[in-house]
């Protein structure tokens, strides 16, 4: 039997829908990692053909591999081939979407040491090409998540090249609080739809 493209799409969507049903977890209350919650959210969007957003693979160069068993290989030495840019990218309603996700246990600020110059430069390039670029910032102790537009992150970074932590008051003033949900867990596309597609940031 020949699998034509539309059949392959249906198979993929069906597979993702099953995965999504198996991952019915409220990460804010059940200890699910922030990254896992975002991945589950992206699976939800994909399964319903709302958006196609994927986590970028990290480019790694394998240097040494051991074979403790013939059927199993163990990587014992590797290094990053190049600096990574942002965590996620994809397409939503014809718009390129690119974002980074960060998490902290602090209650009053997000450490800027987690952001690097090459990431800031990458976000600047995405904005120059009219892409939708932002960061999702999760305060695990407060159980609060914010969508901060890349413009606001870049402006704060440029003050002192990212040497100071970003106060949560700055994030609340310049960003958008993401309401936790069950399906999807981190509905960041709601922010884009309401504020960037025909909204104040358009």
From Swiss-Prot:
Annotated Mg(2+) binding sites: 85, 87, 100, 119
Major subcellular site: cytoplasm
GO molecular function terms attached to this record: endonuclease activity; magnesium ion binding; nucleic acid binding
Name of the top EC class for this enzyme: hydrolase
Disulfide cross-links: none
EC assignment: 3.1.21.10
BP GO terms, sorted: chromosome segregation; DNA recombination; DNA repair
Cofactor note: Binds 1 Mg(2+) ion per subunit.
Subcellular location: Cytoplasm
Keyword vocabulary terms for this entry: Cytoplasm, DNA damage, DNA recombination, DNA repair, Endonuclease, Hydrolase, Magnesium, Metal-binding, Nuclease
Substrates-to-products reaction catalysed: Endonucleolytic cleavage at a junction such as a reciprocal single-stranded crossover between two homologous DNA duplexes (Holliday junction)
Keyword Transmembrane belongs to the record: no
Swiss-Prot/TrEMBL site (Transition state stabilizer) positions: 102
One cellular-component annotation, GO: cytoplasm
Cofactor(s) recorded in Swiss-Prot or TrEMBL: Mg(2+)
Matches recorded under SUPFAM superfamilies: Restriction endonuclease-like
NCBIfam families, alphabetized: PRK02234.1-1 (NF002580), PRK02234.1-5 (NF002584), recU (TIGR00648)
Biological role stated in the UniProt entry: Endonuclease that resolves Holliday junction intermediates in genetic recombination. Cleaves mobile four-strand junctions by introducing symmetrical nicks in paired strands. Promotes annealing of linear ssDNA with homologous dsDNA. Required for DNA repair, homologous recombination and chromosome segregation.
HAMAP family, sorted: RecU (MF_00130)
Family according to the record: Belongs to the RecU family.
Protein name as catalogued: Holliday junction resolvase RecU
Protein source organism: Streptococcus pyogenes serotype M5 (strain Manfredo)
């Amino acid at each position: 039997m020949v699998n034509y493209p539309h059949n392959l799409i249906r198979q993929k969507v069906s597979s993702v829908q099953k995965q999504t049903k198996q991952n019915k977890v409220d990460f804010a209350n059940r200890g699910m990692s922030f990254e896992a919650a975002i991945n589950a959210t992206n699976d939800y969007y994909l399964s319903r053909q709302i958006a196609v957003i994927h986590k970028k693979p990290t480019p790694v160069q394998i240097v040494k591999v051991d074979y403790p068993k013939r059927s199993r290989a163990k990587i014992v030495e590797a290094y990053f081939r190049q600096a990574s840019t942002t965590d996620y990218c994809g397409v939503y309603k014809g718009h390129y979407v690119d974002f980074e996700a960060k998490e902290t246990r602090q209650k009053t600020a997000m450490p800027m040491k987690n952001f690097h110059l090459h990431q800031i430069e990458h976000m600047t390039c995405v904005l120059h090409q009219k892409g939708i670029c932002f960061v999702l910032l999760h305060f695990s102790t407060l159980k609060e998540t914010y969508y901060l537009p890349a413009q606001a992150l870049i402006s704060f970074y440029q003050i002192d090249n990212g040497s100071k932590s970003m106060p949560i008051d700055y994030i609340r003033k310049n960003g958008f609080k993401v309401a936790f949900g069950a399906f999807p867990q981190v509905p960041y596309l709601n922010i884009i739809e309401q504020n960037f597609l025909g909204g104040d940031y358009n």
